């Protein structure tokens, strides 16, 4: 039984499940075998995540977030950094996170004000990050920092720095009261004169924004699978209900209006799955496409919200109570149109690139 089913309104974090997932090879699927991963692709990663999200969105999100940002090491890390940080993540022995969002820097990433000043052989970091996955449970964070504030190019002012969470000055406050995904850890982070060696710079100084965009071009492809999995799970629940529930002397699944709803839901899910798989396949072929990835993320999030709404409607009044799994899926769906790039940001990307330079 999924943990959130047993305790639907309790924030849970089960480290033993992460370790078990690591033992089974479900973590770090896209991490090279040389660094403890399975050496597979983003498509395989997406398929695994879809199946987790189909059953338990909260636990699925926690398992996905364990390696959230690992792409940065593969793309821009030194050999020493890869050897040090990636194997424990792939094995489920270490948890990472990516601290990007700030109180005044959400979709406007370049407004991030958390500063990292090079002081001798160390970076001194100060600032706050909000709504960070694994912020109070992670062993290390990738922190998006302002390192070159005087550069006239906004896109060259930031860097990504590795920060171990046991360093003095790192504090985290676990957030409670989330609408959904309560089995995953989310926290606000406070960095007060946190010192890390300059070797903790990931990639090049001033190249943080470009590196972040490269990450989003990958993560959004498999995050699209979150929406596909949640939608499929909601459809599964709806079908189980309409096959057993009777009204007017008939199974409600026998009514044409019900069948039409199911047909629309199933079609949307298959379309979302197809474009999500296309986005991941292109990445695995070295042909990643920013527009396709944005389309996949935007459409799968919309599909999740629309499908789970219809699925709950088919449950009638029963679906409104928390002893029904569909209620948990309903609460989890909305974030898929918000995190990892709000749907409006994805539309901006798609529209701008489709129209071309004016």
Ranges and model annotations:
Residues 111-113, 166-197:
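Flexible, small-/acidic-enriched active-site or ligand-binding loops
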Residues 122, 126-172:
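A short core secondary-structure module
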Residues 62-63, 89, 104-107, 131-134, ...:
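Short Gly/Pro-enriched turn/cap motifs at secondary-structure boundaries
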